[in-house]
């Protein structure tokens, strides 16, 4: 059984436009959002996996907005919709760097979206995690700040 290429219920709350414009953009898009990546996954690994479904136009790695280091997501854009649909079917839910990755439609990359939206610079989901996840920087950022010794006052 094939994975769905239908739109998920997630919508980018920062989309510039109406809900119907966003829906139209998602239905016509050749761009995918890829989540749950390890902070150590490289652009080359992503290209190798996603190019099995077609010609990849561009990969934009998600970055911590302050440190400019990878923060666990990226955008993959294909030249044609049918190849993006193939990636939705065959890559979503597969394992990359020992993590199950999530692939979803994106309305199209806009400059600035490559940066994490969390208060500490990474993804919001990594701010509040209480579990230890070595592939995503250890404990959640807010918890790490609470348990890390303060070395500024020495």
From Swiss-Prot:
A Pfam family the protein falls into: RRM_1
Function per UniProt: Component of the cap-binding complex (CBC), which binds co-transcriptionally to the 5' cap of pre-mRNAs and is involved in various processes such as pre-mRNA splicing and RNA-mediated gene silencing (RNAi). The CBC complex is involved in miRNA-mediated RNA interference via its interaction with Ars2 and is required for primary microRNAs (miRNAs) processing. Also involved in innate immunity via the short interfering RNAs (siRNAs) processing machinery by restricting the viral RNA production.
UniProt-recorded name of the protein: Nuclear cap-binding protein subunit 2
GO molecular function: mRNA binding; RNA cap binding
Positions of mRNA binding: 10, 33, 102-106, 113-117, 123-124
Coiled-coil stretches noted in the UniProt entry, renumbered to this chain: none
PANTHER family: 20 KD NUCLEAR CAP BINDING PROTEIN, NUCLEAR CAP-BINDING PROTEIN SUBUNIT 2
InterPro entries reported for this sequence: NCBP2, NCBP2_RRM, Nucleotide-bd_a/b_plait_sf, RBD_domain_sf, RRM_dom
Subunit relationships: Component of the nuclear cap-binding complex (CBC), a heterodimer composed of Cbp80 and Cbp20 that interacts with m7GpppG-capped RNA. Interacts with Ars2.
Subcellular location: Nucleus
Residue span(s) of domain RRM: 30-108
Entries under PROSITE patterns matching the protein: RRM
Broad class of where this protein is predominantly found: nucleus
Any GO BP: siRNA processing
Transmembrane segments: none
One cellular component term from this protein's GO annotations in UniProt: nuclear cap binding complex
Record family assignment: Belongs to the RRM NCBP2 family.
Swiss-Prot/TrEMBL keywords: mRNA processing, mRNA splicing, Nucleus, RNA-binding, RNA-mediated gene silencing
């Amino acid at each position: 059984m094939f994975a769905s290429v239908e739109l998920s219920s997630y919508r980018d709350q920062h989309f510039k436009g109406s809900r119907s414009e966003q829906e139209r953009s998602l239905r016509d898009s050749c761009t995918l959002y890829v989540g749950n990546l390890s902070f150590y996954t490289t652009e080359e690994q992503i290209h190798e996996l996603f190019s099995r479904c077609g010609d990849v136009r561009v990969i934009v790695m998600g970055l911590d907005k302050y440190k400019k280091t990878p923060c666990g997501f990226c955008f993959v854009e294909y030249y044609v919709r049918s190849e993006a649909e193939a990636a939705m079917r065959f890559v979503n839910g597969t394992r990359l760097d020992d993590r199950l990755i999530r692939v979803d439609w994106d309305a199209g990359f806009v400059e600035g979206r490559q940066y994490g939206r969390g208060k500490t610079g990474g993804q919001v989901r990594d701010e509040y995690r209480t579990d230890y996840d070595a592939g995503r920087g250890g404990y959640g950022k807010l918890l790490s700040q609470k348990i890390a010794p303060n070395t500024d006052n020495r």
